[in-house]
Amino acid sequence: MGRAKMASQIPPREIPEAPKVGMVSLGCPKALVDSERILTRLRADGYAMSADYAGADVVLVNTCGFLDSAKEESLSAIGEAIAENGRVIVTGCMGNEAEAIRAKFPQVLAVTGAHQYEAVVEAVHEAAPPSMGPYIDLIPQADPGDVKLTPRHYSYLKISEGCNHACAFCIIPSLRGKLASRRIDAVLREAEKLVAAGTKELLVISQDTSAYGVDVRHEERMWKGRPVRTHMTDLARELGQLRTPQGETPWVRLHYVYPYPHVDAVIPLMAEGLVTPYLDIPFQHASPNVLRAMKRPANEAKVLERIKAWREICPDLAIRSSFVVGFPGETQADFEYLLEWLEEAQLDRVGGFRFEPVAGAAANDLPDQVPEEIKEERYARLMEKTEAISAARLSAKVGRHIKVIVDEVGEPDEDGDIGATARSQADAPEIDGAVYLRNVPASLKPGDFAEVLVEDADAHDLYGVIADRQG
């Protein structure tokens, strides 16, 4: 009987290299969350992430299909991925137009619609099968952790899919379906996990945050041994109880909030410091005539009263909104009404859009389409008005101390001065302004909170110094 072969003589078994996936994520923060979920699932299945086209075995393009300009950007991204890599899977909102995509790019491997996670993962498995081995498959996998496409210190928290509104300019319900709320205990578990992992700012997103739980009749779920309703107010209150590992209260920022009556109950939570004093409310217009044509709530006068009441309860409240000019039927009087309303509302942050047709939207067939040159003129005046309001509101902060969260820290200049880019509670990442800091300590890092003395302001941004380093 021969001797057993020594372990050192057994040739090592070659472990197959994990296939790599590249990702291009376009569109809104909700699409970014979809991309994170897809990549998290793929990493759990043994895939690695590629930072460029060349190193990827397959490239995912998560598209946006809301506006024609967004579709053009999506098609351009698909074309670039095909040219640079050749093995491309398309998903996201524009995936609903599979025929159009395949007509332009017949070589795409697969096309799936918005938030069709299983279909995307299956397509990736077909295009680049995960590494399999007789030994690897028997080893329990550790939790790979969630893939994040945002900086470590802030995270988007998606609480629902879809929308029950039927706005004339929008096709979201046809792309993402009716409102479907996530279980509140699942949302809170995700938030708790994110904060424990280093998130300092939670950005609550959906198509209609105020409607959270309507589809499930605000059902109760147990959380920390007590019942909690699937409702925006309960969610905001519970998120306000979270603490970072350092004992800090993370910022909780509410986006896409329709001004339903129960929004009033959130304002005291902001005054108490449990929720960031910031509301992103998509007003879209102020003229009752235009709002009715848009199939939006037309109670702009009541909204002005509520904004005033909100600011009395929480003076630091910042309100962001977006407005569309040139909607079919918008008269000069309607537009002037909007400008007057904005002057009275004194919103802190405003995004403006020229109306553009969206395939499948009811507004395309409305009479009295506004000529492009008038749209441009109104858009320019809208931006001029809102920039003047913003400049005045920001200049009022000069000389005040405010709290900021740091996004980036620069390298020392020739004099050794280190600059940093931060945001105040009035600034959501990527869409609002910034607070630019001078002479920050070398120990400052992204995600840190700091007290800042505001020294200067312009129409969009603030400039300052850490409070204990002034002079």
UniProtKB/Swiss-Prot annotation:
This is Ribosomal protein uS12 methylthiotransferase RimO. Keywords: 4Fe-4S, Cytoplasm, Iron, Iron-sulfur, Metal-binding, S-adenosyl-L-methionine, Transferase. It catalyses: L-aspartate(89)-[ribosomal protein uS12]-hydrogen + (sulfur carrier)-SH + AH2 + 2 S-adenosyl-L-methionine = 3-methylsulfanyl-L-aspartate(89)-[ribosomal protein uS12]-hydrogen + (sulfur carrier)-H + 5'-deoxyadenosine + L-methionine + A + S-adenosyl-L-homocysteine + 2 H(+). The lineage of its organism: Bacteria, Pseudomonadati, Pseudomonadota, Alphaproteobacteria, Sphingomonadales. Residues 19-129 form the MTTase N-terminal domain. Its main location: cytoplasm. It comes from the Bacteria. It comes from Novosphingobium aromaticivorans (strain ATCC 700278 / DSM 12444 / CCUG 56034 / CIP 105152 / NBRC 16084 / F199). Belongs to the methylthiotransferase family. RimO subfamily. It is found in: Cytoplasm. Binds 2 [4Fe-4S] clusters. One cluster is coordinated with 3 cysteines and an exchangeable S-adenosyl-L-methionine. Pfam families: Radical_SAM, TRAM_2, UPF0004. PROSITE patterns: MTTASE_N, MTTASE_RADICAL, RADICAL_SAM, TRAM. Catalyzes the methylthiolation of an aspartic acid residue of ribosomal protein uS12. HAMAP family: MTTase_RimO (MF_01865). Residues 149-392 form the Radical SAM core domain. SUPFAM superfamilies: Radical SAM enzymes. GO terms for molecular function: 4 iron, 4 sulfur cluster binding; aspartic acid methylthiotransferase activity; metal ion binding; protein methylthiotransferase activity. [4Fe-4S] cluster 2 binds at residues 163, 167, 170.
